[in-house]
C-alpha cells in the first residue's frame, strides 16, 4: 500500500552531505527519523474537488471524447475545403513491348492526273491498244502507283509518358456542399456535448465513491466505538458474575454481542478498503493508493437545505447535455435529408487542365514532350433512377422525424427525473432531521441505561438493547447524512447545474 501525497522534505544531496560526516552517526539517525516522520505527517488530505479534477484529467472516456472533438474539427475543415478549387497532378508511365504499325507491309497507291477535257483528276489507268482499261479480276490496273512504306506508319510507343495538372471548381451541387458543412459543424458540437455529458457522469461517479468512503469511515469509527462499549460492558458483567450479582447467561449474551460487533467491524473494514480502491481507480491512480479524504472523520457535514419544489423546465432543457446531443442529432439528420435531395438536382463544375505527353501528335508524331491547355465544364443531370434517390431522401426525412420524437420523449423523461430527484432530496432532508432527533434520544437512552446498570437497577438485556438502539440510530444518521449529499449531487446533475 502506498500513502497518497507522501511529501519528502530532504533531498538526496542533503543525505549525501550528512553521510560524509562519519563522526555524527547519532545525528544522522535522528535526521533520518525526522525525515520519515515529516514525510508521513505531511500527507495532505484530499478534498472532493481534487478527486474530481484527477478523475477528469485521467478518465479514459473523457480522453477519447476529446479526441473525437479533434476528429470532428478535422472533418469540419475538410468539408470547408469543398468550396475551394481542387488542384490535382497525375503522371503516368507505360512500357509497351511492341510498336504500333497501321499497315502490315509497304502499300502501292494509285495516282491521278489532271484531265483538261473534264477539268478534273482521273486515275492513271493502263489501257490496251484500243484504248480500253486493262482489267484484272474485275479491277482496272493503274499505270502509275505511289509507294507508301510501312515504316512511315510505324510509331515508337515502347516508352509512353503522360501527365496532367487539373483544376476543378464546383459551381452548383444542389446544396450538398453547404449541407455537409452544416453536418460537420453540428457533429463537432455533438462531440463537445457528449464530452460534457461524460464529464458529468464521471463527476457523479467520483462524488458517489467519495461519499461512500466517508460513510464507511464513519461507520468504521462507529463500529469501533460500539466494540469498545461492548468490551467495557463485557468486562463489567464478568466482574459482576464473579461477585454473584450477574448470571453466566448474562455474560454469554454480552460475549455473543461482542463477537458479532467484531465481525461487523471486520466487514466494515473490508468494505472501506474496497471503496478506497474504487475511488483511487476513478481518480486514475493505482488501486493500492490510500487517500485520506478531507471529509473523513467529520462529525457532521451540513448540507440540509431544502430544495426548490418547482423549476423552469425550459432552463433545465437548455442545460441538459444529453438533450442537447439529441437536438444536434436531429439537425444532422435534417441536413442529411438535404444531401439526399441534392442527389436529385443538377451538378455543375468547371475545370481547367494542362496535359503533356511523350510521344505527342500535336505536330505530327514525335517522341518528345509537348503539352496544351484545356478548359471545360461538367454538367450532371439525374434523369431516371426508378425512385432510388427519392426513397433515400424519404428515408433520411424519416430519421429526422424519429429524432424529433426521441427529443419529445427525452423532455418528458427529464421532467420526470427532475420531479423525482427533487422529491427524493426533500425526503432525504426530512429523514436527516428525523435521524438527528432519534440520535439524540438514543444517546440519552444509552446514558440512562449505563447509569441504571451501574446502580444495579437495569438488567443486562436492557443495557444491550440500549447499545443496539444507539448503534442503529448512529448508522441511520450516517446513511441519512450521506443520502442528502448524494441526492443533492444527483439533483444538480438532472438540473444541468453540476459544477466541475
Please report, for each region that a protein language model flagged, where it lies by residue.
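Bacterial Sec-pathway N-terminal export signals of envelope proteins
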Residues: 43-101, 287, 293-331, 383, ...
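Bacterial Sec-dependent N-terminal signal peptides
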Residues: 1-59, 499-500
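Small/polar, glycine/serine/threonine/aspartate-rich low-complexity segments that form flexible
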Residues: 90-166, 296-306, 338, 351-381
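Acidic, low-complexity, intrinsically disordered peripheral segments
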Residues: 88, 95-122, 277, 287, ...
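Periplasmic alpha-helical coiled-coil/stalk elements that build and connect Gram-negative outer-membrane
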Residues: 74, 193-315, 424, 428, ...
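Small/polar (Gly/Ser/Thr/Ala-rich) solvent-exposed segments
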Residues: 63, 87-101, 150-158, 168-197, ...
